[in-house]
Amino acid sequence: RLTSFSHGGGCGCKVDPAELKVLLQQVPAHASHPKNMLVGVEHGDDAAVYQINSEQALVFTNDFQTPLVDDPYIFGCAAAANALSDVYAMGGTPIMATAIAGFPVNEVKPDRLQQIMLGGTDICNRAGVPLAGGHTIDNPQPIYGLAVIGMVHPTKIKTNAASRVGDKVIITKPLGIGLLASAFRIDQLQDHHYQTFVESITDVNSAGSWLGDIAEVHALTDITGFGLAGHLVEMAEGARVRIQINADKVPLYAAAEQLARDGVFPGGAYRNMEAYDGRLSFGQDWNIDRQLIFTDPQTNGGLLITLAPEAVDSVLERLHDHGCPEAVSYTHLRAHETLTPISYAVFCLKSGGGGGG
């Protein structure tokens, strides 16, 4: 099994956000921030952006992961889709990619390695992105991903730090991928739920490229290793707002709620909860299993969009017509100005109820 080579799969293998923050604090930023560097390390965004002229900016990212499935082709597809998503999450369009790969070459058969690479190539072809080479090493754990270059107009960049008071939120996919992945690893995921799982992790978030053209879309990111809660905190902190969300309206994959009750969470869900402790607030009497659903790490999760209320209906309609049938908006969500560095993301069961902080 490919998953037997790794201690965590997909975006669940990411370094915990608290440890990452400490690590990066010890690494100085570029001594002279180039004026053309429009997006760098400031807010932990999905990609870097460098302006090359008045009409064009380059979007650059790299993303790789360990297996969260045993099928090598599906692993390659999921890793590639997840990497491309970072460019889409900036409002950009990918134009080229190169592969990043590492395998225990003496333990994994060559045909399985070829299937991983074929999966990545097929996803790039589906997205119209040439895969122009890469770099491969002998490594104890299988890893695969992409370095991706995209393009965006400098005035249409979408960051994770531009939400405004009064914005609404749209999420384009249900939650629960980390739970489904954990259930798969212990042979507790039924076949029909596995098929849903595969469809989600290989679905390309290409809607981000046209969301960049909509001025009323203020902030954009993809929901990945830090879970919905973590990415909401990052988004709220960057804009200095507080986001409140009605948690019982958040869509979940069919098996996720029962798996949560059974405690089938990946380690990343617990690490995320600890890392964002103090910046999250949940409704009264919530048990830990309910809370962990929102810190569950997603692999190639949906887009997280904040936008002006008047644009919600038209954006939702377009999402539903263009491959995001489960996209949902939170008209009961509010962003409130705050001067305190706590409870940036508030989850409650009724609009205005629970939560606090």
Feature names for model-found ranges:
Residues 1-334:
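Helix-biased detector of long, well-ordered alpha-helical tracts
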